[in-house]
Curated annotation (Swiss-Prot):
The gene is cdd. GO terms for molecular function: cytidine deaminase activity; identical protein binding; zinc ion binding. It comes from the Bacteria. GO terms for biological process: cytidine deamination. This is Cytidine deaminase. Zn(2+) binds at H102, C129, C132. It catalyses: cytidine + H2O + H(+) = uridine + NH4(+); 2'-deoxycytidine + H2O + H(+) = 2'-deoxyuridine + NH4(+). This enzyme scavenges exogenous and endogenous cytidine and 2'-deoxycytidine for UMP synthesis. It is an enzyme of class 3 (hydrolase). Its cofactor is Zn(2+). InterPro entries: APOBEC/CMP_deaminase_Zn-bd, CMP_dCMP_dom, Cyd/dCyd_deaminase_Zn-bd, Cyt/Deoxycyt_deaminase, Cyt_deam_dimer, Cytidine_deaminase-like, Cytidine_deaminase_bacteria. Homodimer. Belongs to the cytidine and deoxycytidylate deaminase family.
Length: 296
């Protein structure tokens, strides 16, 4: 079990500890619990979906990287598949606040990058800020997404974001977590291929500036993130943050990044290059290359 979970794990009931210890102790645990594993825990502990998600919140919050605020937020997203995805806030010393990742963004993007096609609900230990409410409004679940908070009845995103503005107001029909293929040709080494594959599935209906980032750590592991645009623009999540999110939830250290590849279209209306380079430099990685997208 990763050391970061030990304090939160100690607060769980003995029965839940017994049920979840094998999952957390698995060498390949990467911050998500499969539908089959979740069903087993629920059956063993007599919990429903909502109760299990709430009990997992301290474990999700333990994944937070919050050197600026010292305020750990955890989220658990439940995919339509039944898989549970951890999310936690991330902050980066030496970068701007605009580069931070909110826990809800973390959980949603985690599910998306793992291939989930839609969310049934999300459970958070603190009320979602307006930024996150707007971010979640880009999802294909729309305002019907169920949000659960401690001490409150479950409510929809529409309850927390009345009179919302979203992709449908801009006649966008392909929503976040919908399956997409931009026809980008794969090429290069494994890290470059991962960045291109991420760009191929990115969500950029407003700018058309598809992009993906792939990171390689000291262990040789590769983590790739996709650009997730938002109808309100500012809540958009850059591809680097998606990759950093997977790396962190996978139990690796941000200081272990050795190489980075950004794949983006030449001559696009916007570029991720400067912001990605600045954030990576703050994390100690200066080996960033940019490769163009080529259509098949």
């Amino acid at each position: 079990m990763h050391p970061r979970f030990q304090t939160a794990f100690a607060t769980l009931s003995p029965l839940l500890q017994q049920a979840i210890r094998p999952i957390l102790s698995s060498a390949d645990f990467a911050g998500f619990i499969s539908a089959q594993q979740a069903d087993g825990v629920k059956q063993q502990c007599g919990l429903d979906d909502s109760e299990l998600a709430f009990t997992l919140l301290p474990l999700a919050a333990a994944c937070a990287v919050a050197p600026l605020s010292d305020f750990n937020v955890g989220a658990v997203a439940r995919g339509k598949s039944g898989t549970l995805y951890f999310g936690a806030n991330m902050e980066f010393v030496g970068a701007t606040m605009q580069q931070t990742v909110h826990a809800e963004q973390s959980a949603v993007t985690h599910a998306w990058l793992r291939g989930e096609s839609g969310l049934a609900g999300i459970t958070v230990n603190y009320t979602p800020c307006g930024h996150c409410r707007q971010f979640m409004n880009e999802l294909n679940s729309g305002t019907d997404l169920t949000i659960e908070l401690p001490g409150r009845a479950a409510a929809t995103l529409g309850h927390y974001l009345p009179d919302s503005f979203g992709p449908r107001d801009l006649a966008i029909t392909t929503l976040l977590m919908d399956e997409v293929d931009h026809g980008i040709a794969p090429r290069g080494d494994k890290l470059e291929q991962a960045a291109l594959a991420a760009a191929n599935q990115s969500h950029a209906p407003y700018s058309g500036a598809c992009s993906g980032v792939a990171l390689q750590t000291r262990s040789g592991a590769i983590y790739a993130g996709r650009y997730a645009e938002n109808a309100a623009f500012n809540p958009s999540l850059p591809p680097l943050q998606g990759a950093l999110n997977l790396l962190n939830l996978g139990g690796e250290e941000l200081s272990d990044i050795r190489r980075a590849v950004l794949a983006e279209a030449s001559g696009a209306k916007l570029s991720q290059r400067s912001a990605s380079a600045a954030t990576l430099a703050a994390l100690g990685c200066h080996d960033l290359i940019t490769i163009p997208l080529v259509k098949m």
